[in-house]
A protein has these predicted regions:
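Short, hydrophobic/glycine-enriched beta-strand segments
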Residues: 9-16
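Conserved acidic residues
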Residues: 8-9, 99
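Glycine-rich anion/phosphate-binding loops
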Residues: 76-95
Length: 325
C-alpha cells in the first residue's frame, strides 16, 4: 500500500521552524512543521519583515479604526496597515500554484482567527472582539476552500488529520489537473471514492457524474466545476457516522475470510471510535492489515487508507493525549 506521495506546496509563517524573525527575535518551535519538512515544499514568509519591520521590533497589534481594524505598532503608534495590505496582495498574486497554508496563531499579521483587537495603542486592555490578522484575512479571502490552519490548532489530532487529508488530496488533484487528461481525472475519482464517501456522499455522487462526462464537456471546463465541488466536499472534517459507514463497507470485503473473534474485535473498535475512546487509526489499521493479508486490490487503491505519508499517519492517529510541540 506504500505510495510515492505527491509533495504539496504550502505557505508557512517563517517564524515557525524557519527563521528567528518574530517581533522578540525568536524562532517558534512547531513539531508539525518540523515533521512536514520531509514531505512538503514550504514557502516561508514573514509579512512583518517584508513590510520593513526589523528584528527585533516593537510588536504590532490590531487597533480599532473608523473603517475597521488597523495594524499599529503599540509603542510608536505607527500605522502599517497600507503597507501590509499592499504586501499581502502582491505576494499572494505572485504566489503561483499552492495547496495550503500554515500560519502563526493569534498573530496580528498572520493569524487566521482569534487575534486580539485593541481600542488603541499603548497600555490598554483588549476588547472582546476577535479577528483575523491582515495577511491571514487576505489568505482566507483569496483562497476559499484551501486548507488553511495555524500551528496551534494543528496540535489537535482530528484537525491535523483533516488538514493533511485535504492538503494531500488537493495536491494530487492539482497534478491531475495539470496533466490535462480525462482518464487521469477518472482514476483520481475512483481512488478517492471512499474519502469522498466519508466526507460528503452527495458531492461524491456529483463528482462521479462529472467524471462520467456524458455531455462530452471539454476538460478545462469540467475540471473547473470538479474542483469547486471537491473543495466544498473537503471543507470540513468528516463526521464519525459516515467514516464508520466507509469502514463497514470495507469490512464487507473480508467477512467471509475473517474469524468470528476478528469480526467481533473490529466491530468493538468501531464502537470505541464512535464514542471517542480511540482514534480513527485503530480501525483503519485493522482494515489495512486485511487489505495486505488478502491482497484486496480495489481497497489497496483507495487513498482513504493511505491519504498521506505513513509517518504522518502514525503521529496524527496517536490519540488524544499526545501532542506535537
Amino acid at each position: 500500500m506504500a505510495r510515492d506521495h505527491v509533495r504539496p506546496r504550502v505557505v508557512v509563517s517563517k517564524c515557525l521552524e524557519f527563521e528567528a524573525c518574530r517581533w522578540n527575535g525568536l524562532k517558534i518551535s512547531s513539531g508539525v512543521v518540523k515533521l512536514l519538512k520531509s514531505h512538503v515544499d514550504f514557502v516561508p514568509v514573514c509579512p512583518e519583515v517584508e513590510t520593513g519591520l526589523g528584528v527585533p521590533r516593537p510588536p504590532v497589534r490590531l487597533v480599532s479604526g473608523e473603517t475597521g481594524p488597523r495594524l499599529v505598532q503599540s509603542d510608536t503608534g505607527l500605522d502599517h496597515t497600507e503597507k501590509m495590505m499592499a504586501f499581502a496582495g502582491e505576494f499572494l498574486s505572485g504566489l503561483g500554484e499552492v495547496d495550503g497554508f500554515i500560519l502563526k496563531e493569534r498573530s496580528p499579521s498572520c493569524g487566521m482567527k482569534n487575534v486580539k483587537l485593541y481600542p488603541g495603542p499603548g497600555k490598554v486592555q483588549a476588547t472582546s472582539s476577535k479577528n483575523a490578522g491582515f495577511f491571514g484575512k487576505a489568505v482566507l479571502d483569496r483562497f476559499p476552500g484551501f486548507p488553511v490552519e495555524d500551528e496551534g490548532r494543528l496540535l489537535n489530532f482530528t484537525i491535523r488529520e483533516h488538514f493533511l487529508t485535504s492538503l494531500f488530496t488537493l495536491a494530487r488533484y492539482r497534478r491531475v489537473k495539470a496533466g490535462g487528461r480525462m482518464a487521469e481525472l477518472v482514476g483520481f475519482q475512483e481512488r478517492h471514492k471512499l474519502i469522498l464517501m466519508a466526507y460528503d456522499q452527495e458531492k461524491m455522487r456529483l463528482l462521479g457524474r462529472l467524471t462520467a462526462n456524458r455531455e462530452k464537456r471539454k476538460f478545462p471546463e469540467l475540471v473547473r466545476d470538479y474542483e469547486e465541488i471537491l473543495r466544498a466536499a473537503l471543507a470540513r472534517p468528516p463526521k464519525s457516522g459516515p467514516v464508520i459507514n466507509v469502514l463497514t463497507h470495507a469490512f464487507g470485503y473480508f467477512k467471509k475470510e475473517l474469524l468470528a473473534a476478528e469480526k467481533e474485535f473490529f466491530l468493538d473498535a468501531l464502537e470505541r471510535y464512535r464514542s471517542n475512546r480511540i482514534p480513527l487509526g485503530v480501525p483503519v489499521a485493522l482494515v489495512r492489515s486485511w487489505i495486505v493479508r488478502f491482497a484486496q486490490s480495489y481497497l489497496n487503491e483507495q487513498y482513504f487508507f493511505d491519504p498521506y505519508p505513513e509517518d504522518l499517519i502514525e503521529v496524527s492517529d496517536s490519540g488524544k493525549g499526545r501532542e506535537l510541540r
